[in-house]
C-alpha cells in the first residue's frame, strides 16, 4: 500500500518522556515528507496552540496546507494561522454538569475553552507534568465555571493517576453522558469528555476527505484509549511499544520501539520505506 498520510498521537507516542521529539523521529519524519511526500498530522488531546514547539521540531509549525487534529478531534486546523477547518465543541451546560460531578469526586479537572486551558484543584504531580510540558494554563480553586459562560468549550477532562478509580466513575456518570458525550482515557491519568461522535477517528476521516486521500492510504499511530477510534478508522493501525495492551490488541502492528526510542520512525521505516524491522 502506498500510504499518503500519517496521523500520530503526541504524548507517549511521538514524544519521549521529556516531552520532546527524539532525533530518530525527526530524521525519519523529515525524510518521509521530503522524499515521499507523506503528510504528517499531529493528532492530540491538547489544544492546537499548545503544541507549537512540537510542530516546530518536525517542521510543520505555521506551514500552509499542513493540518493538526486537536482536542481529541474537536478541532481540525490548518497550521498556517490556525485557520479552523472543523469545530465540534462541547455544550457549556453539559461541561458544567460534568465539572460539578468531578468536584465531588476528588479529581483535578482540565477545561479547554477559547483556546485556553483552565485547571481546577491541581495536585502536585499534575502541576509538575503541566510545567514540564510548558503548558500555559490558569489554575483555579473556586468550584464554579460560571466565569466560562460565553466561551467556546472544546472538552473537559478528569485527572487522577489511579486509572481504575477514573474508570469506576463511568457507570456513576451514565445518566449524564449516555447518548451525548464521548468518553475516552489517555496518558494513564486522564478521563476525557467530548461531544458524542467527536474523536480522533472522525477527525481523521474528515481531514482525509478534505485532502482527497483515501482512508485506506492513512496510517494512525497511538498508545492509549483516546487513540482507538483513530486506529480503527485508518487504513493501517500502529501501536506504540509502550502502549496499553488493549490498544496493541486491535492494531495491525506494534513497534519494537517505545516512545523514547522512535515509535514514528519505526513505522515510517517499515511501512513507507519497507525496511525489515
Region spans (language model):
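Conserved acidic, metal-coordinating active-site core of Asp-based
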Residues: 101, 105-221
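Asp-based phosphoryl-transfer active-site loop
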Residues: 2-19
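Hydrophobic packing residues within well-ordered alpha-helices of enzyme cores
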Residues: 51-55, 169, 173, 231, ...
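A generic "binding-loop/recognition-motif" signal
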Residues: 47, 72, 115, 189, ...
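Active-site phosphate-binding/coordination module
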Residues: 25-126
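Short, structured coil segments at secondary-structure junctions
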Residues: 58, 64, 72, 176-179, ...
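Mg2+-dependent phosphoryl-transfer enzymes with acidic/Ser/Thr/Gly-rich catalytic loops
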Residues: 1-5, 23, 192-277
Amino acid at each position: 500500500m502506498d500510504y499518503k498520510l500519517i496521523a500520530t498521537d503526541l504524548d507517549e507516542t511521538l514524544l519521549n518522556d521529556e516531552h520532546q521529539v527524539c532525533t530518530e523521529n525527526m530524521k525519519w519524519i523529515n525524510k518521509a515528507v521530503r522524499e515521499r511526500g507523506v503528510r504528517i498530522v499531529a493528532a492530540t488531546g491538547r489544544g492546537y496552540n499548545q503544541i507549537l514547539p512540537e510542530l516546530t521540531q518536525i517542521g510543520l509549525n505555521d506551514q500552509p496546507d499542513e493540518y493538526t487534529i486537536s482536542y481529541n478531534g474537536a478541532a481540525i486546523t490548518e497550521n498556517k494561522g490556525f485557520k479552523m477547518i472543523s469545530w465540534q465543541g462541547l455544550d457549556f451546560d453539559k461541561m458544567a454538569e460534568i465539572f460539578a460531578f468531578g468536584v465531588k469526586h476528588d479529581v483535578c479537572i482540565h477545561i479547554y475553552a477559547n483556546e485556553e486551558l483552565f485547571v481546577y484543584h491541581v495536585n502536585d504531580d499534575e502541576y509538575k507534568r503541566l510545567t514540564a510540558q510548558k503548558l500555559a494554563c490558569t489554575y483555579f480553586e473556586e468550584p464554579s465555571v460560571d466565569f466560562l459562560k460565553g466561551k467556546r468549550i472544546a472538552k473537559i477532562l478528569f485527572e487522577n493517576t489511579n486509572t481504575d478509580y477514573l474508570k469506576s466513575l463511568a457507570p456513576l456518570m451514565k445518566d449524564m453522558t449516555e447518548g451525548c458525550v464521548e468518553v475516552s482515557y489517555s496518558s494513564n491519568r486522564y478521563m476525557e469528555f467530548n461531544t458524542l461522535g467527536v474523536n480522533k477517528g472522525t477527525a481523521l476521516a474528515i481531514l482525509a476527505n478534505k485532502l482527497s486521500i483515501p482512508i485506506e492510504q492513512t496510517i494512525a499511530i497511538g498508545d492509549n484509549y483516546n487513540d482507538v477510534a483513530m486506529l480503527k478508522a485508518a487504513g493501517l493501525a500502529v501501536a506504540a511499544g509502550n502502549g496499553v495492551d488493549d490498544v496493541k490488541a486491535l492494531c495491525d502492528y506494534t513497534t519494537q520501539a517505545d516512545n523514547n526510542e522512535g515509535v514514528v520512525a519505526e513505522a515510517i521505516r517499515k511501512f513507507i520505506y519497507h525496511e525489515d524491522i
